[in-house]
């Protein structure tokens, strides 16, 4: 099975207008990603406010994205839920709509044991035939995969990768030492992309690439060509942007940044609120300093 979980994957924002999906803005956003040749797009993840979507909105978002992208780049859907049955519904709908794979985190809030986490993903694996990437974000979910659980899950045929949002740079080395060779590990933390990939990672699920896909793509390309100096120069330029995009809870800052650049409305769903004036000013200054344009 081809492993689509590698390279630059943009964790895409979801545009809203008047509390509805803004499909015109969605098309602008997707075409911007396609133009800059990202390796895949993640729809309805945490950056995409997936937990705020109704099931009907989720279906519409995926279906519209699939139609606009038209197989030019892989689409990965977010299927995280603390209700295993509902996560299976999301995965089943993703299969029906024909996305290319899906991502899911351990169930949040309910704090399952490692056995419970394994059974959750085993049920998802049995219920669909799509490739799966595990999503490790313990600051959001409250629980995480142990290394042993990752090893057990990697033995399931279609569980092909791990997205790790942590800062434990020893983890990719530990996981790489125990899993099968074709199991991919990607960072979901923009600030550690180079260090993580130096330790065995093979890609980056990025927030910054919503607005700077060209720079993010160039960074990875230089890294893959062993141009460490060139990659580090771009990384250092982008570091203020990475930090600005996490001044407040993701996706509050990136939604404002996209709005400032004309990609979408600055509309975010409760309980999240729009960026503070202070955060807005810092984001604007960094966008100007980096000469980011759409």
Curated annotation (Swiss-Prot):
GO molecular function, one term: (R,S)-4-hydroxy-2-oxoglutarate aldolase activity
Marked site (Part of a proton relay during catalysis) residue numbers: 46, 109
Keyword Lyase: yes
Compartments (UniProt record): Cytoplasm
Annotated pyruvate binding sites: 47, 205
GO annotation, biological process: diaminopimelate biosynthetic process; glyoxylate catabolic process; lysine biosynthetic process via diaminopimelate
UniProt-annotated catalytic positions: 135 (proton donor/acceptor), 163 (schiff-base intermediate with substrate)
UniProt pathway: Amino-acid biosynthesis; L-lysine biosynthesis via DAP pathway; (S)-tetrahydrodipicolinate from L-aspartate: step 3/4
GO cellular component: cytoplasm
Keyword Lyase in annotation: yes
Primary localisation category: cytoplasm
One Pfam family named in its UniProt record: DHDPS
Enzyme Commission code(s) on record: 4.3.3.7
Keywords, alphabetical: Amino-acid biosynthesis, Cytoplasm, Diaminopimelate biosynthesis, Lyase, Lysine biosynthesis, Schiff base
Root EC class: lyase
The reaction(s) this protein catalyses: L-aspartate 4-semialdehyde + pyruvate = (2S,4S)-4-hydroxy-2,3,4,5-tetrahydrodipicolinate + H2O + H(+)
Subunit and interaction comment: Homotetramer; dimer of dimers.
Task of the protein: Catalyzes the condensation of (S)-aspartate-beta-semialdehyde [(S)-ASA] and pyruvate to 4-hydroxy-tetrahydrodipicolinate (HTPA).
Family: Belongs to the DapA family.
UniProt-recorded name of the protein: 4-hydroxy-tetrahydrodipicolinate synthase
Organism expressing this protein natively: Rickettsia akari (strain Hartford)
Gene name linked to the record: dapA
